[in-house]
């Protein structure tokens, strides 16, 4: 079985918007999100709904719900079992906002360009 490593995307200046997003969540949501990240690290590309869903062009969402609050963290798979978390948002609409998917794709392109 492949070993997976979960990595938070970092900008060139070292800032990690997705890490900042997760750390800013309320205590219960943050605890559940870290639990789901552990499951993602263990299961990797075999993780499916209700925890994970493929959105578009290799971008996936990790799905976290506490009460009526819904949070998503988008990610993609990279070489050698790396899972790169790109961005997170609080879900307020039925569909994932296209701008969040676009941001995930932009960060993926940036990551691949810088990491080779």
Report residues per predicted region.
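Basic, Lys/Arg-enriched alpha-helical interface segments
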Residues: 1-70, 79-83, 92-116
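Conserved catalytic cores of phosphodiester-cleaving nucleases, focusing on short active-site segments
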Residues: 86
């Amino acid at each position: 079985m492949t070993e997976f490593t979960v990595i938070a995307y970092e900008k060139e200046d070292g800032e990690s918007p997705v890490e900042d997003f997760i750390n800013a969540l309320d205590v219960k949501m943050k605890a559940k999100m870290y639990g789901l990240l552990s499951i993602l690290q263990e299961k990797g590309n075999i993780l499916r709904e209700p925890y994970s869903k493929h959105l578009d062009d290799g971008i996936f969402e990790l799905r976290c719900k506490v009460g009526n609050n819904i949070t998503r963290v988008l990610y993609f798979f990279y070489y050698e079992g790396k899972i790169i978390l790109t961005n997170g948002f609080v879900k307020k609409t039925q569909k994932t906002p296209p701008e969040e998917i676009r941001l995930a794709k932009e960060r993926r392109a940036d990551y691949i360009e810088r990491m080779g």
